[in-house]
Amino acid sequence: MELYLNMLSFWYILLATSFFGPSQAVYQAPLSVDESQKVTIEEGFQIFTSKHSPQHSIRIKKQDGSICDAHSAQYTGWLDIGPKHLFFWYFESQNDPENDPLTLWMTGGPGYSSMLGMLEEVGPCLVNEYGNGTKYNPWGWSKKSSMLFVDQPVGVGFSYGDEGHDIPNDSYLAAVDMHRFLQLFISEVFPNKLNSPFHISGESYGGHYIPYLGAQIVRQNKLYPNEPQVQLKSCLIGNGCMSHMHTTFGYWETLCTTNPGVEKPIFNETRCDIMAKNMPRCMKVAEVCRRNPDPAICLSAQSVCDEGITGLYNKESDVKGGRNRFDITTPCQADDICYVQGLHLQNYLNTKLVWDALSPPKEVKEYKFASKNVEHAFGLTSDSMVPSTEEVEFLLSNQIHIMSYQGNLDLACNTAGNLKWMHDIPWKGQAELSSKALVPWKSVLASTGKNETVGRMKEVKIRVTDSATFATRYAFVTVDNAGHMVPQDRPDVAFDLMNRWISGETFV
């Protein structure tokens, strides 16, 4: 989210590489092991080594409910890829762990820990208001799916790299590591999930992470059919930063018009006029950056758009300025991410109780929810300036279902920009999707028990090839009265949305 902050200068948030993606499952404790597996025990961890890639191994241990009352089996550990070490936290489904799907969650940034998504949004437990414990989350996504949370890329959260080794600096490199992680996770550690449907979810810079990881999975499955196959079925992208150009374009509509929850425009006529005048030049230089993604060119384009459009709001998006780019109707409560829950979470994950349970290695000195080093590394490349359009198009053409869901109060990765970007994706369903109007969708609210309108949506189901045996779904779903983190703002609606999607149900 810090990237969000700077980026929302805007470029940064956009590109979220899709790349963490582990699958999960297992119910035995200890984990079951067959004779063909290479497994050792060390300092309380079981260590599984890949038969396909000997330099890859996973350290894993089972957790009880002392640090997170998950209502199901849970495991933590690290994937070791030579000098790189990725931390994960895995929860079996509370419903049917044998048959329910696997869902990976990736928080964005770049540089933000997926523990934010776990302990603030969709995990089975949430950090309490004091930052000294957790409470059960009745709307956690593990009620219907096994959930895997990974701190990625290396250098984020509890993940770390050996001294002297570089950290990944773009979405593709991150996706390569995550794909290997998934292969080892489902083939060696939890082989009973090898054939389970797999979904990739996340938010913000996840708009890059998710498509990149999804594309890596599809390509590697085709190239190496004899290696473990990750059974990717769909991607769920929440307020994704997909394209810097489109996100910036959406600033005017988000700040200068109204929508449910916004009774009058946030900006006055003077500021809206300034943005409108500067928009053509910003779009021109952004297009130059897109076609020539050299870091110097794109940084120059970013400066133009920041000065004339995004900076008019973003420079005031902190505690002092009072504005909140993640929810334009509420004030910023804490610098960097604007939400105090992030600080509570960070405090909790640094307690002795948690460290005794997780057993981080000596290389991990403390937990931080944001990594300046990873943010800086990505910022030196053109990764955040290049939209994830090609990866999304590739996934759709390979029959991977995609849902983009949007909290309408978000500015950082706004609804207006992402809807325009979605219409511009060149694929077989483009014409039909663009021609459709958004229609209301309903959800039964926990507060009233009534089936009420909660947003708008549209969807197409397209047979992408003549030989396709099923239609590929692409859905755009909005949620009113929610900002950048829909599951935090409207947990019951977000759970309903996720459950309908992975079970193949419609929204209207």
UniProtKB/Swiss-Prot annotation:
This is Carboxypeptidase Y homolog ARB_05721. Involved in degradation of small peptides. One of its GO terms (biological process) is proteolysis. Belongs to the peptidase S10 family. Disulfide bonds join 282-305, 289-298, 332-338. Its main location: secreted. Keywords: Carboxypeptidase, Disulfide bond, Glycoprotein, Hydrolase, Protease, Secreted, Signal. It is found in: Secreted. The active site is at residues 204, 410, 484. InterPro entries: AB_hydrolase_fold (IPR029058), Peptidase_S10 (IPR001563), Ser_caboxypep_ser_AS (IPR018202). Its EC number is 3.4.16.5.
